Amino acid sequence: MSKTTSLALIAALSAGGGAALTATMYSFRSQKQPTAPTTTTSLTSSSSVPVPSTQVFTNPNAPLPPALAAPSPPLPGSVPGSPVNPAGLFEYGFPGPVADLASRHALISSYDRRTRNPHWVVEHITPASLAQRGGDRKHSAFVEDTSIPEKFQAKLKDYYRSGYDRGHQVPAADCKWSQKAMDDTFYLSNMCPQVGDGFNRDYWAHFEDFCRRLTTRYPSVRIVTGPLYLPKRDPVDGKWYTKYEVIGNPPNVAVPTHFYKVIFAEDGKVGGNVAIGAFVMPNAPIPNEKPLSDFEMPLEAVERAAGIEFATKLAPQRRKRLCTETSCAIVVKEYADRQKSFGKGGSQSRSPSP
């Protein structure tokens, strides 16, 4: 995908997407060969991860894939024959960047120390996991993630009177199968500042419900969710600028301009088809009348915007487009009704976020 094409897509994303652009661009397929990433990770893992009794897909107790479980890659050394040795700095410590990976009962997350938000959070839902009711939101509380070095943590006080919800990336309603799973969704490393009315408590919540309803058709649905910080063209000078608020005192947590979800709906067969849907929404009020298809984007556009590749090992012949396989449409539910159905408990300093 060219930079010109990417800028055009980013412009569409900044404006809230568009069905015509989506239809035009979705047929694009990148021919670029994947390259092996070089990252530094810090890993937090749950000691025991129960599996819903009728779950037959991926066992969360299985070892993490090598890409997640491997230690830091070998540090670069000096070039033979060079009169200088920049690698000598690493004797004092390697600067990173570091992605704090957490493997918990309900999710796996990668945390961005610079923005104090996750890069991405992955979840897996099935008809069996959603049918169980072992967890209740009223027994959960928002908590700071102490597995992250203190100076890089998002803090509860950062959100206090900020005007933003503590927006779940993996929603609590997806993790009712145990209280521990429910509790795992309340770490601040699973949160981003989200606009409440019109977004987190409305359109975004309807979108999360759409993801859950996919399990009526697909036996296994995997979802990766995360924030974006997209540039916007200045109408005066025509240049692109990335601008976002930072909440907290002192400023600590970045407020994303947009959020993405990439959905992998599996047919349940070994080597079977996977219906992929990639969506980007602005962190702003969205009318409930807005078609969900307006926010569908090519996977490659989301990857370029996020700096992340989601499906390098998924063969093209196994990929299907989610919104041609099933109807991509939200069902509007009032916020008060969702509170009752989700089992939400007492109030805090602000309305709890979905």
What is the predicted function of each stretch?
Residues 2-354:
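Domain-level detector for secreted/extracellular nuclease and nuclease-toxin modules, and
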